[in-house]
Structures are given as structure tokens and as C-alpha cells.
Amino acid sequence: MRVLVLTKPFGDLPPEELADQLAEAGADGADLLVRDGQTVTPSTSWRIAETARALRAKGLETGLVSTDLTSADSEAERIIGHCAEAGVPLMRVGFYRYDAGLDYATCLDRARRDLAGLADLAARHGVRLVLALHHGTLHPSAAHASRLLDGREDVLVHPDPGNQAKEGSEDWRLTLDVLGGLGRVGCVGVKNAVWEPGAVRGSWNCRWQPLADGGVVPWATILPGLTGLGYTGPFSLHVHYPADDPLAAVRRDLGHLRGIRSEPTTTSPAR
């Protein structure tokens, strides 16, 4: 089980310090987020290679770089080029949003064209793109992502049951089946969430929850299930909830994740 850690909670730590933190937490590598306020920003994408070197020095991999890129432009050219230079195999693209002011078909057509251009650019550099199943986008579920991909085989998918819980849920087996099997999966996002009463009477809100504290996503079923089907790709652990001590939070959730993995396989109740 290869577990990458999304570097978001560590902010703008220098590469060497980030590598130290991830190694101390017990991660296998980084899901390196390229965003303002992070170790690597869009304007300092040359630091992808520097960060990858720092991680390698600690025995860690840069298994995935996560970006906000949605179309092929000069910024995308730089970031993808630096991913290739650093030997990063996968790059997560940004989020294609639904605009209620436009009709769905128009949004989908524009997103398809933008993704196609980005995928072609990545292919020229030898980098594989992954599309996350993410709430608040045109691709919150396997079915919606499949419509966006429109048969493209060069873009993999990044299932994320925690994110999918924000808009309901989707049986993880159905997700894989709709996508076309494990061969279409580049990485699996790991986090959990809870639904709780909101401030307005009768309303409910979904908030991120420490993985170690449980939540609405049945990881004790999903993880053994993926293993049983032969999934050998990476997992990306996300700590999106407020954490005063990111290292302690990551270490705790990572320990819980590995503990689930080592438990006997649980089966879903008969239907």
C-alpha cells in the first residue's frame, strides 16, 4: 500500500523541511500541491524538481503533482515541463466547474476542449493526467466524469469517496464499474467527512473529519475491497480539516489508514 500525502496542510515549508515532515509522518511520498501559499506555487514551478530531490533524499517519491490547471497555456507548459523534468508520472488537473448561467451542454463542451488541449500538452512531455471526482464540479461522480472524458483513454481518474460524500455518495464498486475498471484509476483520494445540523433549523452541513475519527465513508470496506480487486496504485491522504499541528494530524490519520489496511477484510451486508 503506497500512501502519498497531499502537502496542502504543510503550507509553504521549504522543500527539505517538507521532506523531513513527510518522512517523520511515515508517508511513502508526496502528492505535491502547486498553489499559492504552498512549497511550490505556479510562479515557482521550477521547485517541483527541487522538492522531488529533497523527497528522494529521504527515500520518498513524488507520486503525484496536484494543480489547478484546466487548459493548455504558458503556465501549464511550465508546470508540466517541470513535472517531466522531475520524473513525476501523474499530474492532477484542476476542476471544471458547472456554470448555472450557461446550459450544461455548453459547459461540458468547453471543458472537453480544454481538457483535450491539456492532455495533448502533457502527452508531449510524457506526463499522465488524472481527473479527480470532486464536489462542485462537472465531474463529481464516475458517470459525470465519463461524460467529460468522452472516451479519452489518456486521462486517468482519481476517485475520492470523501469528496463524493459532499454531494451524496456513490458505491465504490459502481464507481469502478462505470469508469471501466481499475485500469482507469490513477490514484485514490482518502479522507472522511460527517454531516451535522446547520445553524438554520432543518439544515445540514457536511464538514471534513479526521480519518482516524471515522465518518460517512466506509473505508473499512473500501480499502480491503480495492486490495481484493488487485489495486496496486497510490492512495493520497488528505488532511483538509483545521489542524494546529499538521505533522501530528497526518501521522495519526496515516496510522489509522494503515491499520484499516491490516485488518481482516470486511464484507458488505447481503442485499
Q: Which sequence ranges carry the predicted segments?
A:
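Charged helix-capping and loop-helix junction motifs
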Residues: 43-50, 76-78, 104-116, 142-146, ...
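Glycine-rich, proline-tolerant flexible connector loops at the mouths of alpha/beta enzymes
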Residues: 31-52, 99-102
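A short, acidic, flexible beta-alpha connecting loop/helix-capping segment that sits on the rim
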Residues: 236-246
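Hydrophobic faces of well-ordered beta-strands that scaffold small-molecule active sites
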Residues: 3-7, 30-32, 62-67, 91-93, ...
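C-terminal helical cap(s) of enzyme catalytic domains, especially alpha/beta-barrels
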Residues: 246-266
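Active-site-proximal loop/turn and secondary-structure-junction residues that shape catalytic pockets
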Residues: 9-11, 34-36, 68-71, 95-99, ...
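Acidic/histidine-rich catalytic cores of soluble enzymes
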Residues: 19, 120-216, 267-268
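Active-site acidic/histidine proton-transfer and metal-coordination neighborhood
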Residues: 16-20, 24, 57-61, 70-159, ...
